[in-house]
């Protein structure tokens, strides 16, 4: 085992232990004034409605219902905070889904304002994970979200969800296209991760990435 491989293995094991420990819902914030104190690093999760964000959060934390999927896409317009570790070492932030066709214009405007202000003003936000459905690839609304992240100067990783739903050769093509798209954005991390909440593909790697991005 090389030195780099040993470091990756150690980080992966540290992340496994951390996520096997205390993980608790802290609060929901419908506006910035309700945000928790900025005292620990935060990693945010963003993605289109029905991208599988709740399922991925549940798989990441090893819990069945730490994050509940909304019945109506676009219904949840709050930032949901989860504490990880005892004492708390980092927070996961479940951001409201975007691209919801059924949502009223006012709801969409409120979403943009809440998310934009959070991204621009949250000093402890270390990374945003942008979730993309592997079956569909990047959509125009995803590109809009990436531009918002670029403008806010928030570093982000692209994470493919539901990778088990397509064939291996299709996944390789989607990964290549997505990485090419990510390279066009100044704030995007060059590595794109492929995951599956069902088969747990990429979950250990995602935990390690979260730990590394949090800088703890």
Each language-model region and where it sits:
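Canonical P-loop GTPase G-domain recognition
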Residues: 20-32, 165-216
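Hydrophobic aliphatic residues
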Residues: 60-64, 119, 210
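Conserved nucleotide-binding/hydrolysis micro-motifs of P-loop NTPases
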Residues: 75, 90, 97-99, 135-138, ...
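Switch II of P-loop NTPase G domains
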Residues: 33-40, 75-81, 96-126, 134-148
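Residue-level signal for inorganic ion chemistry
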Residues: 82, 161, 206
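Conserved G1/Walker A P-loop phosphate-binding module
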Residues: 1-102, 215-216
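Hydrophobic packing within well-folded, soluble alpha/beta domains
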Residues: 56, 128-129, 206
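Conserved C-terminal guanine-recognition region of P-loop GTPase G domains, centered on the G4
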Residues: 113-190
